[in-house]
């Protein structure tokens, strides 16, 4: 057949009369526009795709479960490329057979980040699959529905410099935490306590005595507030305090739900069947999120939640030994208290240590928060009232803390509701040296001993470091046991100090503040300065994460933020605001603020953007950020190879080279940056490889083990590979410096989970000597990905150290490092495909609300079998942009196999049901009227002159070649 008819009908036309047609368009079913824009808030009600109506940042982590299956818009492009690259194999029977690179095809499909969770209508009688658009409904025979996919686009706004073909790039940057803003960690009195002045003293030399209730400045029952004189006296250690549980209003309803479960349990005479662990866990998680919402939670949160539910079930069993002890007759306590005590024991056992407010798991911190509203300081009460103590098997043990009470808790400054002027406690964090004037000869070694008497300095513990090195030399790299915090001295250890735990209330001394309070701590190995101090709120809470809340905020520069390795001192969020589904809404001020950065126009000029918008589209910010980030990474790493240059010339470091010449593809993915680093620095190639090749190179390197991994590296990067192979004969420090490039292959990926969050990898650190340090790539102390690694690379040795001879220990260390990287699986903790790969539709829908509005369409591919095999794309869409533009966008879906797309048909339907048809390539069209009995509809006749279409199982065959 060389002609295809597509009926277009309105409401009232009997659909069963069109049963013989494989593709129909119902223009009578539509979603009314609002304000000239498609009403995308109706998407959850449509037979379209699975996006929930919720906060945009919450939507990023939504697992689409209300769908009928996931499709890949580019599956034909991938499989056709695989078909094109078939290899002929002569079998034993002398017959020739063809085989595709199945490994590549499967990887490409798994690696696709634009999967669509379709939510369609299914008609059992007609066997049709219905896809809703805002202006019509498209129905297709189920036999041919496997190539259907949505084609939605946000309309560009010229005033914002939009380039919406880069939406995927924006999606990618958010996934690798490079399109984020930050707020410094904020600490305040726990809202679960009323803190009351019980007694006072005139100076700290006068101890508090049991039973003493002497008051000097305050009346009986005076509560301590941070903006009150009572707080100042407390900080000075002049007040003795008592704590009582208090109910924060934000969780009142949730605590009431817990009380209902508790009351049922009590009334049933402690029947464990009344304690529904799943229901409890949901409520406790809600409490944990409301009080301290980190938005992004640990990947293993679901598994831990299951373990917590099991611990609850075990602890409430009537014959559990600890439960029996808590219910001893001599213990005259309330059953309500026992209920929360048992929950806290279950939470502590699940985490295998004491639970704090800063706990990353919402169900566990929610348990602590809920228990504090009833019991005050929970662990102190458990020890004094119930004789329960933390177990010796807990890590860390923290038994000594049971004699103390803790009044401060961490909250998220993004969500903290407070008026300007309110006093808070917060961490400041800035780079120790943003840039330095250096020469190649002197290098930029890390100065471990800064001269400043007024600061605390984080220092290496020489004994602990020596023990680690001996263990490494004798037994290889121990990724599970080697930790950075273990080789630092206790004083000023920025990986272990914790104000929430270090500021405490004791019986004899009142509140004691840690020695480091209000003092700068210089951590030279992290290039970091941190200080905790009192500060004031400067701005009210906002859904815009870019709003800086304090008078001394953390940096807003996207590249400088990549340099702040110590994640424990700040919180991050994607620079997005508003709802996932909205017709029109304000965007974050992030993009506008970033556009004010020095060099902004210079960086964008490299991308061909000359006219700089005042309020840029996020796609402009994404291009700026990745381009500048790439230049910074290259600048950092160029310092680690031998160079021919004026060794005494003074230059600023680090500093991105905006004049660096590179060619080829535009950089749209961090994988291209990583591959370019090796191509440019080692192979002297300035051409940027395309995104698919770059991602595949990294995937191939990761999947190999041992010698095969090194062979694959050498296959793609021969010069670098030869340097690694020559490591066994290394004689000077420069010979082993190339090892520090290896983490680039393993640290970053937008659908990657680390095998373990606390595993460490080895890295060379250049100080007055060459050291090796454990880098915990996914720990709670560090940011993930390259952010955990990059700032260590700002340090590089002087020429004298580069050329100094290796000692025996360094040579052995280098061999062990190479052995570790050849076999590491630190990146191989699985993936989160259902969540991560299905967000492209979300980004496009959300971006439409920030820019010019929303376009939707659905694409079907018709296979041509004669005279040449090819395909024709047929799209049904709205009429809001020219059909030729839509056709061009469809061609962009075929970057790998464009030669197979020989024709495009665009059927555009407006809100009134009127339609127009556009065709190009091997297909032409005409529109006719068709009478069926007393009914009339339109028929779009598509003519494929000289070509025959068919082959319903085209995709099935391609996937099985």
Curated annotation (Swiss-Prot):
Q: Show the Pfam families listed in the entry.
A: Orbi_VP2
Per the record, GO CC terms? viral inner capsid
Keyword annotations: Capsid protein, Clathrin-mediated endocytosis of virus by host, Host-virus interaction, Inner capsid protein, Viral attachment to host cell, Viral penetration into host cytoplasm, Virion, Virus endocytosis by host, Virus entry into host cell
The Gene Ontology terms for molecular function here are: structural molecule activity
Q: List localization entries.
A: Virion
Among the GO biological process terms of this entry, one is: clathrin-dependent endocytosis of virus by host cell
InterPro entries on file = Capsid_VP2_Orbivir (IPR001742)
> What family classification does the UniProt entry report for this protein?
Belongs to the orbivirus VP2 family.
Record's function text: The VP2 protein is one of the two proteins (with VP5) which constitute the virus particle outer capsid. It is the major target of the host immunogenic response. Responsible for viral attachment to target host cell, probably by binding to sialic acid. This attachment induces virion internalization predominantly through clathrin-dependent endocytosis.
This chain's protein is named Outer capsid protein VP2
